[in-house]
């Protein structure tokens, strides 16, 4: 069974993925960390001086639009590319943000379950970021 966990920034998606993975006995992966090495670090390291994947990942909040654009470019020819690659390594995918990718993955049947993590009673919603999963059209 493949599970997609989505929600706003800092609402606990990774924590849910970790605990669900422990409960079900399966692996979870953060799509941000997964894509950092594949699509983000090679472009942003020379610009911002990142020496490691961790350096780049830890600074992601300061460059959210760039991250979104780089991952979108990585998936442009195949909107299911990231999910196909991540799901080859784990059953729980945490953090999809692109509507085109979301729809393509649902159409392909990549996910059996989609969970929305909502901590809006204690955390702000994400309105000023490249989050377009809730929109009907691609804006990038």
Regions found by a protein language model. Give the residues of each.
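ATP-dependent NMP and nucleoside kinases share a basic, alpha-helical "lid"
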Residues: 83-128
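P-loop (Walker A) phosphate-binding loop of NTP-binding proteins
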Residues: 8
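ATP-binding Walker
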Residues: 11
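Short, charged, surface-exposed secondary-structure boundary motifs
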Residues: 38-42, 122-132
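ATP-dependent small-molecule kinase phosphotransfer cores
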Residues: 31-91, 97
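Walker A/P-loop
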Residues: 14
């Amino acid at each position: 069974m493949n599970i997609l966990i989505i929600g706003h920034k800092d609402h606990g998606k990774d924590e849910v993925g970790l605990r669900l993975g422990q409960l079900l006995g399966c692996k979870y992966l953060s799509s941000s960390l997964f894509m950092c090495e594949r699509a983000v670090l090679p472009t942003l390291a020379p610009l911002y001086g990142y020496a490691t994947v961790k350096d780049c990942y830890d600074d992601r909040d300061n460059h959210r639009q760039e991250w979104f654009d780089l991952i979108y470019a990585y998936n442009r020819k195949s909107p299911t590319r990231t999910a196909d690659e991540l799901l080859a390594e784990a059953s729980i995918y945490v953090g999809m943000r692109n509507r085109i990718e979301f729809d393509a993955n649902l159409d392909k049947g990549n996910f059996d379950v989609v969970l929305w993590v909502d901590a809006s009673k204690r955390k702000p919603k994400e309105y000023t970021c490249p989050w377009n999963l809730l929109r009907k059209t691609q804006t990038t």
